[in-house]
Amino acid sequence: MTTFLGNSVTFTGKQLQVGDIAKDFLLIATDLSQKSLKDFEGKKKVISVVPSIDTGICSKQTRTFNEELSELDNTVVITVSMDLPFAQKRWCSAEGLDNVILLSDFYDHSFGQDYALLMNEWHLLTRAVLILDEHNKVTYTEYVDNVNSDVDYEAAINAAKILP
C-alpha cells in the first residue's frame, strides 16, 4: 500500500519489475520539445520520478542523483514530474543547475499510467527510481511506500554504479 499525506493512493497499470523492457515514453522538456526513451538510446538511464520539483524532498532527490551520478560514463540522469516545463526550467535556474534533464508528464499522463506511477487521487506522480541499461532493460526499481519519504539513495546509487 502506498500513502501520500497519510492517505492511501491507487495507481493504474503495472509496476515495472527488474528484467522488464521499459515501454517508450513521450515527455515534454523544459524547452517544450518532446523527448522519448529513444532520445537516450544506447545510454544507461537513471529515471528519478518525483511528485513536484518544488518540494524539499523532490529537490533533494533531483540534486542528489545529479551530483552523484551525472559523471558516470554513458549514463543520463532524468527527473520526471508532473510540473509544467516552465516551473521545471525556473527551478533549474534558481538552483543553478544547467545540465539537469527535467521532463514533464503534464500533457497526457501516459508515462505515469504506463509505468504505474500516476497517483489517481492526486494526478501527480509518486516517488520512484527506475534504472535502465542501454537496451532499456530494467535493472533496478524502487517505488516508495510513503511518497513523503526519501528513496533509498545508497541502494539506487550503488545499483547505477555497478551497471557494466
From Swiss-Prot:
Pfam families in UniProt: Redoxin (PF08534)
All residue ranges annotated as the Thioredoxin domain in the record: 16-162
Reactions this protein catalyses: a hydroperoxide + [thioredoxin]-dithiol = an alcohol + [thioredoxin]-disulfide + H2O
Keyword Secreted set for record: no
Gene3D superfamilies listed in its UniProt record: Glutaredoxin (3.40.30.10)
Family in the record: Belongs to the peroxiredoxin family. Tpx subfamily.
Protein name per the record: Thiol peroxidase
Organism: Streptococcus agalactiae serotype III (strain NEM316)
Lineage, opening ranks: Bacteria, Bacillati, Bacillota, Bacilli, Lactobacillales
Gene name of the encoded protein: tpx
